[in-house]
Amino acid sequence: MASLKDMRVRIASTKATQKITKAMQMVAASKLRRAQTAAEAARPYADKMSAVISNIAGAAAGSPGAPALLAGTGRDQVHLLLVCTGERGLSGAFNSSIVRLARERALALMAQGKEVKFFCVGRKGYEQLRRQFDKQIVEHLDLRSVRQLGFVNAEDIAKKVLARFEAGEFDVCTLFYSRFRSVIAQIPTAQQIIPLVVEEGTAASTTSYEYEPEEDEILTRLLPRNLAVQIFRALLENNASFYGAQMSAMDNATRNAGEMIRKQTLVYNRTRQAQITKELIEIISGAEAV
């Protein structure tokens, strides 16, 4: 059995850990408010951008001059999985849930005879995926040096993806990220971004519009920007999801530390009481012997 001194050291260590997890919980809660506001503010713009493009694309999708970002390459053989995760851990299942969804999609595609490539944004996803798909990771982008996520970061990713598409390196690109719903609910999401999936209801709209310039020219300008907008939205959703998951994880860790301290203190008090009782018995026995 551990000595009383060892028990005191263990209790003090657990209390120190509890202070750290509590501080991390408070920091995550503070950052979550800003991240959640940014993610929710980006949703209407991203949704409206998709709706406008879908409306225009409904008439242009079948035309010979339709942009490749809309019409695709005509093949479905090479898939690029754009996996966006966090740069840090201590966030529960946030990173692993995104990686799990991407891994399942990759294995399903490979089982169908498709070729799969990975573009990893974020250190944690890259570290997990390279254990199984090291040779299939074509690019890894580290955002640890970025203090504040901006549209320029999404544009940089979009340009890299677009350059690979124009070079004929893949046919389909799917974006993986975590959609923020609440502090305790982050939804791993897969969204096809190349070629753009046109919403059926919008594409079938009977409302007729006249466009100036022509639909194909408008789409040629809008589609690359929409790619960056959807990636930016995913980064913001991921950021909010990360802080929500971290806040929840640190809250659980703080509660668990409190329970451990309670149990350790109980064992310490019982051991101390037993030791005092033993010493008293020895003193009494010695007095009686005299």
UniProtKB/Swiss-Prot annotation:
GO terms for cellular component: plasma membrane; proton-transporting ATP synthase complex. InterPro entries: ATP_synth_F1_ATPase_gsu (IPR035968), ATP_synth_F1_gsu (IPR000131), ATP_synth_F1_gsu_CS (IPR023632). Keywords: ATP synthesis, Cell inner membrane, Cell membrane, CF(1), Hydrogen ion transport, Ion transport, Membrane, Transport. It comes from the Bacteria. The keyword NADP does not apply. It is a peripheral membrane protein. SUPFAM superfamilies: ATP synthase (F1-ATPase), gamma subunit. One of its GO terms (biological process) is proton motive force-driven ATP synthesis. F-type ATPases have 2 components, CF(1) - the catalytic core - and CF(0) - the membrane proton channel. CF(1) has five subunits: alpha(3), beta(3), gamma(1), delta(1), epsilon(1). CF(0) has three main subunits: a, b and c. Belongs to the ATPase gamma chain family. NCBIfam families: ATPsyn_F1gamma (TIGR01146), PRK05621.1-4 (NF004146). Produces ATP from ADP in the presence of a proton gradient across the membrane. The gamma chain is believed to be important in regulating ATPase activity and the flow of protons through the CF(0) complex. This is ATP synthase gamma chain. It comes from Bradyrhizobium diazoefficiens (strain JCM 10833 / BCRC 13528 / IAM 13628 / NBRC 14792 / USDA 110). The gene is atpG.
